[in-house]
Amino acid sequence: MTRTMTVLAALCMLAGCTPAAERSTGADSTAQPNAAAPRADSARRAGAPPDTTPPADISHGEAPVGAPGASPAPVSARLAPREPGRLHHVRMEMRHATVEIASGVKYAAWTFDGKVPGPVLRVRQGDTVAFTLVNKADIPHSMDFHAAEIAPDKYYRNLMPGDSIQYRFVARVPGAFLYHCGTAPVAMHIANGMYGALIVDPPTPLPRAEELVFVQSEFYLTRNRNTEGAYMLDWFEMLGQAPDHVVFNGRAAQYSTHPIDVEPNQLLRLYVVNAGPNRTSAFHVVGGIFERVFLDGSMANPLRGVQTVGVPMGGGSIFEIRLREAGEYPFVSHAFADATKGAVGVLRAVDPNAPATARTGPPMQH
């Protein structure tokens, strides 16, 4: 396989399929949303098979792996160390912002702190989170922490524009947890971008590892008459569970165009949280087998020696793996329709003693 072959082409070869032609969203990074709608055409809606003629680079609108000039720079997947102390002050603002969800595709999102997903939070089991939430948007929003054991009617209530709330909770259970807006209709608020990950470390540290976090989610697009050059949520596509993009960390295939560099035989710990709102993540690393998988908060009985693990909507799991030799290892949701729509990336195992020329393509930016 050459460096110019894309990850999706490689995955299709593994699956014995032929990549479908690119949809209008993301197919041309210079295209404007008002020039081409993201929907499938009427024949597809009627159930006709899609055109299977592969485009020139079989890239689903994304640059080949490591292609020079691939843009935009990726959202960092590196998990930052936990802040010291047992009391963590966290402040978030809910506001609406335009974000890029695929190459050249802008979306009018609802956000925590202006980005999708929201900031990654990290504490230790038994730590206290002192949380402040401020609504700077023009509609009601709220917060639901899956890691918290508190009364929803008291703390997860809707905040009107300009309102705020403060409360504390103790993170009693370790694991990889989702947080999200809980305002009805919840599916609309999640599909518009209001979610993030909260990592709760066990009291006894896990073995040292390179740690990465991936939040899977979906986008359902239609033209936005209110925000020039951006898409908005298609409510009926969302109800029909027909996403235009399925993504890790808010942007389709960003870690295919910008692989994440790791070392061969290095222990990797991947925190995978699935915001949904509709699609289960069938998380898999091509060319590797998970040594241990901690489902949700269960540290006592990890799965061992497994190939693919489902992460349900609203759930999260912790995966440990070693990539046994130098090379490129795609990670995907093994629901390949979702991988084709952007739930795909690459872990690039590079020997640290190899010459710099061995690192083809740009390094991970973080």
Predicted ranges, named:
Residues 1-7:
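Bacterial N-terminal signal peptides that target proteins for export
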Residues 18-366:
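Copper-binding active sites and cupredoxin-like electron-transfer domains
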Residues 10:
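Conserved RecA-like P-loop NTPase ATPase core
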Residues 13-16:
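C-terminal motif of bacterial Sec signal peptides marking the signal peptidase cleavage site
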